[in-house]
């Protein structure tokens, strides 16, 4: 199938500016997607610079392969939660000048009804980031129970009508397996008062199911555990999130590593040990929101938050 999708990276200029790209630096774009950020990073890299991009979506890998003639560029097909493994394999652990994670879905994924992410276009109810692994959304919905579905919608969608929606989905599935996106969207829409929503009523539920079946929060937490081991002292960490669950996870991580650990009063400890404990591993630089102009041009930017931090030099 010919790919006619386009994708405008959110906060692109702000991202490149805060990465502060060095001519011969080493960078990781942990979410290649449609390649907008990677292509822009390559424009700023010198001939001796290196960019390692990661994506689990096979369609993104096909797009990335168009850049394979650029000797500075390396594409890795896999989950960004394995970022430490990839860094070790490429012998760049502790040498990376900047890591970027854009946690938003690409237009390529949303606008292709065959991927099953859209609640306004009909397609198979899939929702897998990598269609070759895991179970599709329709299969999980068929196997799950009311309690689990309710908790997923409540936790990952923050959906106020989770109980009623979960009940109606389970009840419908007992009569007929839900296999299409618009089929699910209609069940959700019929479950709640339309006047309660300014946006599409199925938005939160689709988000919750997608996050759950792709283990998105777990994947993010795993990646965050390793970034400090990968960055060079002074290296930048940029994370672009699009909903509160992601942003809370990122914010919690940055705050945790930007403060020295708690030392109980009266604990027997040497001055050297105390100085070592006082070292903060991360410095929070800023958080950036898209401008009104950008949101007008690119509506998907409205919920974006770019958080920027820098690994401290404690040596």
Swiss-Prot record:
Source superkingdom: Bacteria
Binding site for S-adenosyl-L-methionine: 35-37, 55, 80, 102, 109
Keywords tagged on the record: Cytoplasm, Methyltransferase, rRNA processing, S-adenosyl-L-methionine, Transferase
Enzyme class: transferase
Catalytic activity of the protein: cytidine(1402) in 16S rRNA + S-adenosyl-L-methionine = N(4)-methylcytidine(1402) in 16S rRNA + S-adenosyl-L-homocysteine + H(+)
Entry's Gene Ontology molecular function annotations: rRNA (cytosine-N4-)-methyltransferase activity
Annotated GO CC locations: cytoplasm
Signal peptide from the UniProt entry: none
Disulphide bonds in the chain: none
Pfam families: Methyltransf_5
EC number per UniProt: 2.1.1.199
InterPro entries: RsmH (IPR002903), SAM-dep_MeTrfase_MraW_recog (IPR023397), SAM-dependent_MTases_sf (IPR029063)
Subcellular locations according to the entry: Cytoplasm
Single GO biological process annotation from the record: rRNA base methylation
PANTHER family in alphabetical order: 12S RRNA N4-METHYLCYTIDINE METHYLTRANSFERASE, S-ADENOSYL-METHYLTRANSFERASE MRAW
Function: Specifically methylates the N4 position of cytidine in position 1402 (C1402) of 16S rRNA.
Family the UniProt entry places it in: Belongs to the methyltransferase superfamily. RsmH family.
Name of this chain's protein: Ribosomal RNA small subunit methyltransferase H
Organism of origin: Buchnera aphidicola subsp. Baizongia pistaciae (strain Bp)
């Amino acid at each position: 199938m010919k790919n006619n999708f386009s994708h405008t990276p959110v906060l692109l200029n702000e991202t490149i500016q805060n990465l502060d790209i060095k001519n011969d630096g080493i960078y990781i774009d942990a979410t290649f997607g449609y390649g907008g950020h990677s292509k822009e990073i390559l424009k700023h890299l010198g001939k001796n610079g290196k960019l390692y991009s990661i994506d689990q979506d096979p369609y993104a890998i096909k797009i990335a392969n168009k850049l394979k003639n650029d000797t500075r560029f390396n594409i890795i097909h896999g989950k960004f939660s394995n970022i430490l493994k990839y860094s070790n394999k490429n012998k760049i652990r502790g040498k990376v000048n900047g890591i970027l994670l854009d946690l938003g879905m690409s237009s390529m994924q949303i606008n292709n009804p065959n991927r099953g992410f859209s609640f306004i276009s009909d397609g198979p109810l899939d929702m897998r980031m990598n269609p070759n692994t895991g179970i599709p959304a329709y299969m999980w919905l068929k196997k799950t129970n009311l309690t689990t579905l309710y908790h997923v919608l409540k936790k990952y969608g923050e959906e106020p009508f989770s109980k009623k929606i979960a009940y109606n989905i389970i009840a419908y599935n007992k009569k007929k397996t839900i296999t299409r996106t618009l089929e699910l969207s209609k069940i959700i829409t019929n479950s709640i008062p339309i006047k309660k929503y300014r946006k599409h009523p199925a938005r939160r539920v689709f988000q919750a199911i997608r996050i759950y079946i792709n283990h998105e929060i777990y994947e993010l937490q795993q990646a965050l555990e390793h970034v400090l081991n990968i960055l060079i002292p002074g290296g930048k960490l940029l994370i672009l999130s699009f909903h509160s669950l992601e942003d809370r996870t990122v914010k919690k991580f940055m705050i945790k590593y930007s403060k020295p650990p708690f030392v109980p009063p009266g604990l027997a400890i040497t001055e050297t040990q105390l100085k070592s404990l006082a070292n903060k591993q991360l410095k929070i630089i800023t958080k950036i929101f898209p401008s009104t102009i950008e949101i007008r041009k690119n509506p998907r930017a409205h919920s974006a938050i770019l958080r920027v931090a820098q690994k401290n030099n404690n040596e």
